[in-house]
Amino acid sequence: MVCLGNICRSPLAQGILESKSSKLIVESAGTAKFHVGKSPDLRSINIAKKHNIDISKQRARQFSNLDFQKFDKIYAMDNDNYSKIISLAKDQDEIDKVELILNEEYPRTYKSVPDPYFGQKDGFQYIYDLLNSVCNKIIEKYEVR
């Protein structure tokens, strides 16, 4: 799960997916290093907590080339981060691991999960709802619980 700073969308996506399956290894990262080592945004922590998910112990980290070897699938939250991840890929196999997360629910639409960072508190509920729905699709696709 990859967004820009790894404090809003991707930690929330990680927490949601982890809450739905203990069989998946899920991590999150940011393409930028603004917040490396910091906790998720308090608004993400609070919206997750509202849904009985604890993401407070997560710490932001920057996406690296090693993630291509470590993970079978890499989900980008938006087109900009997708492009940044792809630019780090060394071959087609690595490129093929990267997908816009909302394409799992809305195939080939290339929709982005909006960044709620500069928005209002209710934007985080909207992001939670989007990510919760797409995480259900991911669980169905890979048939893991």
Please state what every model-predicted region is:
Residues 1, 76-77:
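Short beta-strand scaffold positions
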Residues 73, 83-145:
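Phosphate-binding/catalytic loops
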